[in-house]
Amino acid sequence: GPMVFKGYWNLPEDTAYTFRGGWHHTGDLGRFDEDGFLWYEGRKAEKELIKPGGENVYPAEVERAILEHPAVDQTVVFGVPDPTWKEGIKAVCILKEGHELDHRELIAFVSQHIASYKKPRYVDFVDEFPLLEDGSPDRAKIKELYGGPQE
């Protein structure tokens, strides 16, 4: 509330958009599991929205599908330039120790769990992610490292 946060400095439009109807709309997504626990699922921020062929795809949904694969330990999903779809979906993944997987296998697996237009078109496998101070993946740095033109 206003005792903690009055708004964004010199950004009245952003402040008005974020504070609506007496609520602070953070853009955080969550879900309740069958035991009633609330799980953080990512952000529903416009800047994270990927639009392949004009469709709306949230990275958190694609990440959940990828993490269902038994060989995948961590993943970060983001949009990249794509010659066909204007924006393509890219996944950067860390595999669990002792597991092997190629991009075709992962894309086929994900296609069984989410709509075809939401599956990643590009996949990179890496050994580690750059991390933020809190230990979470540094999404901006990962996109900077792996988000250039795709082949």
Ranges and model annotations:
Residues 1, 6-7, 17, 29-118, ...:
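AMP-binding/adenylate-forming catalytic core of the ANL superfamily
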